[in-house]
Amino acid sequence: MAGHSKWANIKHRKERQDAKRGKIFTKWIRELTVAARQGGGDPGSNPRLRLALDKALGANMSRDIIDRAVARGAGATEADNVEELTYEGYGPGGVAVMVECMTDNRNRTAAAVRHAFSKCGGNLGTDGSVAYLFERKGQISFAPGVDEDALTEAALEADADDVVSHEDGSIDVFTSFTSFYAVRNALEAAGFKGDDAEIVMQPTTSAELDLEGAEKVLKLIDMLEDLDDVQNVYSNADIPEDVAAQLG
């Protein structure tokens, strides 16, 4: 939607904050361990592990740390009892929020997530309370400068769902969850390697916010992202560009 920043600004803020806090290493160590536990330690036959490996290397994580995390998950060493959990709720302004976590203590994590929602004027919901407002999608992002026509043609030939161009010249290719890795591989074979690629929860509806609402929602997202057990936070917040320009 022209004139709106929607979810991209929140994602980019999150990446900067993760890097600033050093949390990104912990995030990818957990993802590597869980991915290896679920699908084995060979990235050639485990697409989730391959994606986590690419992300970890992109974050300048050492190969030694990566190998230890994979070995722990694959069973070569004693693994931590880490499980994946997703919490759902509503934030200020009726914004739907999904919080993906990895934790070795679900009671601790649930209490921390509930506290964040309560403190910021939101409500932690039950399973399914907002999940129906999101779709699990693949997202492959390209920096400004890529040939839009050629990329669009290659993406459609690879059976991508949608190609979205932004005012700054960047482009996102969206895929179904099941075809993400196939589309990514096809684009790379055609000469288009994305600057970022990930599985996301894409909202199917949006909640437009004014300045006050945006500030409150971003406070909630910041508080959730500060929690050690939180991996990803998704919302259907729609922040118009004129409002985003007023945010600190």
UniProtKB/Swiss-Prot annotation:
Keywords: Cytoplasm, DNA-binding, Transcription, Transcription regulation
GO MF terms, alphabetically ordered: DNA binding
Membrane-crossing segments per the record: none
Keyword Calcium on entry: no
Keyword DNA-binding assigned: yes
Residues annotated as signal peptide: none
Localization annotation: Cytoplasm
A cellular-component GO term for this protein: cytosol
Domain of life: Bacteria
Gene3D superfamilies assigned to the protein according to its UniProt record, in alphabetical order: 1.10.10.200, 3.30.70.980
Gene Ontology biological process terms from the UniProt entry: regulation of DNA-templated transcription
InterPro entries according to UniProt: Integrase-like_N, TACO1_YebC-like_2nd/3rd_dom, TACO1_YebC_N, Transcrip_reg_TACO1-like, Transcrip_reg_TACO1-like_dom3, YebC-like
Family: Belongs to the TACO1 family.
Protein name: Probable transcriptional regulatory protein Pfl01_4410
The species this protein was found in: Pseudomonas fluorescens (strain Pf0-1)
